[in-house]
Amino acid sequence: MTATIIIIAVTSIVSFMAFNNSTLLHRFIFYPPAVKRKEYYRFFTYGLLHADLGHLFFNMFALYLFGTAIEGVLVYAFGQAQGTLLYVAMYVLGLLVSILPTYIKEKDSPAYRSLGASGAVSAVVFAYILIYPMNFMGIVFIPIFLPAFLFGIIYVVVSFYLDKNQSGNINHLAHITGGVFGVVFMFLIFSMLKGINIFNYFIQQIQISSWQDLVKFGY
């Protein structure tokens, strides 16, 4: 069983439990005043919770699609044990790093709460974009597909806009921070452990690819 499947299973089990258990929900949710009381575990446990079934499904579906690929890349590059450890480290640290700017911004807000694995999933998705920039990506139920690097650019721009305008209850800042972390993490582990500049690999893939089909329609 892969680490991706284990993460999905654990997250799904805890999320389903919390749907009907308000005590568990309040104990695990990211709540700045509680963190200030040194409940630091909340930097991680909020990622085990989701607002509803749809929220859980989309996060875990994305993690399955992109996490399976990135876990495979890391296992191939670093071996089974080290590759799996690095993958899990990226996911867990993604939870922490993606919520830190939100904590700084909302640390004095007693009404603020956050939950969901989106920040860590964004780290995995952007790691995928870095490795496979010319693979086509799209949004579920919208039959338009773009090269991954273009999708990533649009995603970041839209997220910045929505965060600036405080649109909805989605933590767009965590998505952006998580995505940046995923790219930085991949760059660091490949440069430090393999002596490979993954950014050069990213640019080369874009340069050698055909630009005739930048957009695909349909499934």
What are these regions (language model features)?
Residues 1-219:
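A detector for small-residue-rich transmembrane helices and their helix-helix packing motifs
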